[in-house]
Every structure is written in structure tokens, then in C-alpha cells.
């Protein structure tokens, strides 16, 4: 954060004016940061008002007219000129998107990038006393249509390809269309800001026996007229250039380094050796220690003109991609994965590992994709960021990928990831499209294309400088799914943007952090399970065929078959809690046979093959096939929710058994942009779905799974910790009437290791005519923690389960559950985060659950569901 004296915030109340869909004049007061949607909601002019009303039912369509109108934002402010005032600037951290800015009726500039912070010198426009700033916003789609339209296609909408704003809000398969306009970040006036720090960072140069050698890097600007005597600000005194004072504090706040330097050049570097450094590790592998670097720009008398502070972590990151030896186990696994591939992969016979090391420790990456937490991103509060990032850590995740169709998130997001040890992959903001480019390969390049490339270059440079200090960012991705042609087209626009725009900027500011030109990335044709970054969302048709055209027998093995060296998008589909669905669907639509409300809030994939079997059909059909016919609307929601649990469990248990081959799995997706069924693990309101609890369980340091291999039942115990573990294992064979067989074992699991145990003579109970009568439940007790895995030879809907009676007692923040019979998929539904959920209870077993209110808590009700109720 940069601290500068002499500034005036223009956040607060502005006047917004325009016309409604009937051309009636609108003029209202609204809060900035704010956009057209949020200000109309603030004034109860969107379907009764309130942020959530626009999300209820199909109300969003009734406000679509907003995107076609021009809107004017205006406010007055007072300014007092003194003899010392020599320079006045106005800074807009976020303007969405095409707009014209005026001060006192004089146009000062226009803007065309919502991802860019604009600063303008308004010294010649401002006056003593009352001043007026006005911003006229123009409809983005109308502006985009004015540019030359070559073959610039985009998934979901081609109306976004020139426009540098949040791409997903043109409509995606998980969010409605919300093409908004407005001021979505802070507005500030700066007086006599002759010095500005653009970039401050501490980079690890290496670790020696003496300590960690850190390069302190500062890039800034200063107005030379301020220092060479052309004019003087009486607040400060200079005989020469200003001074920069670097200060480093350790994680305990103790000052360990201080050094002053003359600020003569745009870039300053200094070096400090940190003795006995406390290293930054991702969650689950150690503490995420943060040091503090402050740069103060001073005059000769030591008075501070401006200062900037960043936190940094001392960590060494490397990604090892080593070719597999032919006939090795990894090579054989890679060959098997060709069964998933298309003809485009034919002939590919070189495979390679993908292993992330932090401080020489191999990291197994577990997490999900982050999308904007609101279609109006200025509405995402610090509390919502904290809730979501904390939930990720509590869910045993250690990585989020910031997806390229959203935005560069607020500083608070990255600060929280630094603090909680959540690693970040950061995409640059291009997704699922062919974006404009301009170079020698373009026939008759136009000014439109040249301006787009320059706009993109400025956006990239500014945001890299803003984010480079964060230790949580472990690598950059050039775009999302724009280079899936791989080596078949080496001169496509996306590859040229990565090579000629993005890569040079990263070499300049962040040369040591890895850059992948795109994701997926790897192999001759990108999206290979056998090397690099893979997107299994690109194989959605295989999931679709399995759900639509089979009875889903063997679903655990099917979902678990999709492993890769590093999966950057693994799909999972499900429904949120009933308490959440009630927030965005009216009661009649929760039970209607048409499912129009569900489909509206699920959206759909643009591929023609999903026209008649859309994403909602995947959820609805999959839930019915796995868990049986729906008893009522509430049961439908319950079963569509636990579909996500079983899908996630199947994937992650397979990954945990395959960590010699696969080093990471990032689900599509972590959070929601609006209230929806679909892909997320945590819903829009901050309430975890069943998939989240499966992720939490299977991503724990020690976790188990039960498989049937080579005619034997096998217990697999995985340890992702950095120390070996001793475990006690108890296996129970449970029928509808009770436990019919038990066995206990012990095991020692090496750090980063996998142990396979073979129980005795249990196969006969789960084979042949008996396979639907019992399940295997395996408890692993290790270091004070416990994991419970289960195995069934048939789908849950085919099990012969006796009806269980589960009793719930609730007191304060504790819930006690007790059952008389085996209870499958016990699910607590409410606006809460539970310490555990969607679990199995053995006959006569009691279980205690702790609860805390979720971020969007609005009801104290908790309902209880289980499969054999």
C-alpha cells in the first residue's frame, strides 16, 4: 500500500443519470465505488431493490436494458488553491469501461480499460472553490462493434473481444450476462504528488550459508521540476535528489535492515542478506512467514514525501519437468491416459513430470479455480474475501487459480493468500477466444488492432508491477484456453500475445517466476494428461456420455480415471444447499417439473452437443442414477448436492493414490459469481456445498481410500506431510443391520508416501449375490486425527439399506447426532459452515459437529438428511 500526503478521496455520494428502457429520465444519488446496477439497486429501482433481488428467479433478464444506455456519473468537490499547489492529479483505479472524463465542463481524456488505473494531470482544469467531475459511460457492446471485426471469435459472446473488462459478465456457463458500467474502484485527487512508487518488491537471489540474499527493487517516478529549482514546495527541502530509505522487518516486527539511497534513477536496487530466514511455505507444509519491506521517499530533512509497504515471503520455487523413461511406471501410466485423448494426440510419445517444489519440498497442489465473487466486482467486501480464503485453507486446499475471464483481484485477495499460505496461479485476462493482434503476419493491420495491443500491454505492465511482490503467486498463465491448438498453429494471435506482449514484461519485472504461455499447456497439442497443465473440462463430452448413456455403474472408477501430471481444471457439478436455493428460486420452481428456474441458474455450455442434455441435466440425471428417484423437491436438492461429494471424492482419492504421477488437481471451480447450480464448491453466499466437504476430507494430510484391485480389497493410506506417520486402521464390514465383520491393522506411512494394506478374507462379503448387502467402512486414526473412507461394490441407489433413524440435538455451536442403523451421506443443510458434513454413521454411533454461521447467513434453521431415511 502506498501512503501519500495531500490527497482528497472522491469516494462517496455521486449523482448518476440516464434513461430507463422506456426512455424515462433517471437521476439518482449513489455510492462510489459503484456501478449502474449497484446504484439502481441502492435506490430500490431494480425490481424492488437490494443486491440479491436482481439474482432472484429470472429477474436479471428484466434489467438487461441497462447495458444499452449511456450513463453519466457526476459529483462536486471543493478545492482550495494556495501558493504551494503546483500540481493536481486525479486517479481512477477502476472505470468500467468506455468513458469520457470532464472537469468543469472541459473534457480531459477518455478511457477504455476496466483493468487499468488511470491518472490525469488536472492542474489546468481545476479552480478555487467548487469543481465538478463528470464521467460519461458509453455502452460497451456498441463501442466494441465499431472496431474492425475480423475472425475474432469468443465463446459465449463475440461482443467482448476488444473490450478490456470482465469477460465472464457477457454470460458464461455459470453466470448470467451483466454488462455493466461505472466506477468500480477508488477515485482520489492528489496534490503535489511529485513522487510515485510504481513497484516495490523483494526477490530471492539465492540462499547461501550466510542466509537468504534478497534483492530490493523499486521502480518509481519523480517530477524533476520539483527538485531542480524550477519551483519549490515550501513543505520540503532539497539540495539534490530525494532519498529512498529501505527498511526490512522480520515476521515478528523486528527491524533487521535499514539503508538510504539517492533517488536519481527510475529504478533502484539494493541487496540484503537475511540471516536464519524464516521461510514461506504453502498451507500444510509449514508456516507462511511474511517479512515487511517499506520504502520511504524523503527530503534532505528526513520528511517523508511518500511511502509504500509490501509484505514478502522468502521462498524458492521451481517446477521440474523431467522426461519419463520408456517402460517406467510413469511412462506406462501416460500411455494408458491416451485412452482419454482424441486423434490430435496420436503419435505423441514423449511424456514428462510436472512437480512443484517450494524450498526444495515437493508440493502436492490441491485446490480449485477462483472466479470473481460478484458480477459487480467492486461489491466484493474484505470480509467476503476473508471468508472465502479462510474456507479454502480450512478445507485443506493450498492453491487457487485466478481464472483469466475475470479480473485482477483486489489487493486484499492476494494479501490473504500470502497470509494463509494459499498458492496462486494468476492468469492474464483473456479467455476462450481469438483476440485481436497486430504485427507483420496480419494483412492490412488497422489502428483498432494496434490500439488494442497497446492497451493490453499497458494493462499487463501495470498489474504485474502491482502484484509481483506477493509470495503466494507461484506462476503466471498467459491466458485461459486460447492456445489449445498447441504446436499445430505457432502464429495464432494468443501465442503471439504471450510471446511478444506478456513475456517481455514478465522478464522485465519478474524474471524468476515461471510463465506458461497459456493453460492448458503441454505436449504437441495442448491439454495433454501426460505432460504440463491439463484441463479435463475439455473432455466434458466424456463425462456427459457416461452420465447420460450409462447407469453410472463404476462411477468411482470412472471419475477417478481422469488423472494427469497437473490438472488445472477438473469438472465437478452439483447443487448448493436447500437453504441457498431458497434465496434465488421461488418455492414453486423448486418443485416444478419444468425445471426452468434451475436451468436458468445453471446456464449451459455453448457446444451444440449440450443443447438437449445441458449442465442441469447432468446434475439431475447423475443424482437420480446414483442415489435413486427423488421423493420430493427437498430430496432432489439433497441428492443433487451429494452428487458433488461423490464426484469430488472419487477424483481426489484417485489423485492421492497416484501422487507419483500426478502432483496437482485444481477443480473447476471454487466459488460462485452469482447464485447458481453448477460447478462451484462454495456457493455465492459463502456456504460450502457437499463437494467442499469431500475436498476437505480427501485433501487432509493423511487420508484413506478403499479399492478393489486384482480380486483383492486394498486399503490405501496417503501421507502428504513432511514427516512419517504411524496409523491405526479399523475396518468394518457393515450391512443394513449392523457390523458383520471387523479387522484392525497398523501402518507406518513415510513422508509423502503411500501404503497399501490387504485385509483378510473380506472379498466374499462384497462379491456375487452379496455385493449390494454391505459396504466396507475404514477408519484411520493418526496423530490425533481420523479419516473415514468407504467402499461399495454397487452404486448407492442399489444398496440394500435398512431405514435408519438419526437423531439431532443442537445446543449453541454444537450438534450431536446419533443413529440406530448405518446412515449413509448424513447431510446438515443450513446457512452454516460445519466441521464435518456428508458422512457415514455406523450403527449406534454418536458424532459431534461444531457449527459457525456462513458469510451469507440469513436463517438459523438446520435440516437433516440421509440417504436411507
Predicted regions and their residues:
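Secreted/periplasmic carbohydrate-active enzymes, especially glycoside hydrolases
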Residues: 1-375, 381-399, 408, 657-658, ...
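Substrate-binding/catalytic cleft of secreted carbohydrate-active enzymes
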Residues: 399-419, 424-605, 643, 664, ...
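Substrate-binding clefts and catalytic carboxylate motifs of secreted carbohydrate-active enzymes
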Residues: 8-9, 16-20, 179-182, 476, ...
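Short alpha-helical segments and helix-capping/turn motifs at coil-helix boundaries
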Residues: 105, 118-122, 170-174, 501, ...
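Soluble or luminal CAZymes and related metallo-dependent hydrolases
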Residues: 69, 179, 210, 384, ...
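Alpha-helical packing segments of well-folded alpha/beta enzyme cores
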Residues: 72-76, 388, 395, 413, ...
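Generic structural signal for hydrophobic
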Residues: 391-392, 417, 467, 655
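Glycine- and acidic
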Residues: 275-278, 394-400, 445, 628-638
